[in-house]
Amino acid sequence: MLNRNELTRYHRQLLIPEFGEEGQRRLKNSHVFVIGLGGLGCASATYFVAAGVGHITLVDFDVVELSDLNRQVLYWEEDIGEKKVLVAQRKLSKLNSTIEIIPIFAKITKKNVFSIIDGAQVVVDGLDNLATRLIVNSACIKHKIPYIYAGVSRLRGMITTIIPGKTPCLACIYPEGSRGGGGLGVLGVIPALIANFQALESIKLLIGQSPSLAGKLLRFNGNDMKFRIDEIKRNESCKVCSQEVVK
């Protein structure tokens, strides 16, 4: 049941026929995990809070640095040196005090990933390296948690929605495994744009709608302002999601 304040706060969302009060109630009872609070994570977390996702867990192991401020808009100069998860929790709570925001200051590893994502209904990728993404991908496949992958570089970005048992996983897309990350340049508006698509796909899942990018890879190129969507196929010999592995 939505109270009077919630009916007022989310009024513009409630007017959407595909959303309505039932969709808002579902969001209120949902739990999203945002792993990585860089340019992607800052933006997606902000819109989850604004939209009324009731429970949000933020995971990161880094502190705010001056070089973050061109794209990580939750942090200001006065926050330099502070833990990102705590700064984000503090500021997001001021945007919407009704949301439970849980900070986890930790680096994702193969040993801790299962305990960290326990209870997630959707895991949203805010990471900056493929090695950690593949760890999260494997855990989500095993626990049957939808995983919204995204990556950005320079003026480009991409996103896909991974539904365990139904779509290709990240290891299908990157079968060769780990590669370097975090060293490429990026303009701040690119992660913000892609992260908003992540938030939209997540919200669709949480309110019971079909995501638009399941089994599809959306690419954006800011150089010519073009979008491209490609079908992606499951790798039947994937070491993570093939039937032989998951059964």
Where is each model-derived feature located?
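Adenine nucleotide-associated cytosolic modules
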Residues: 1-247
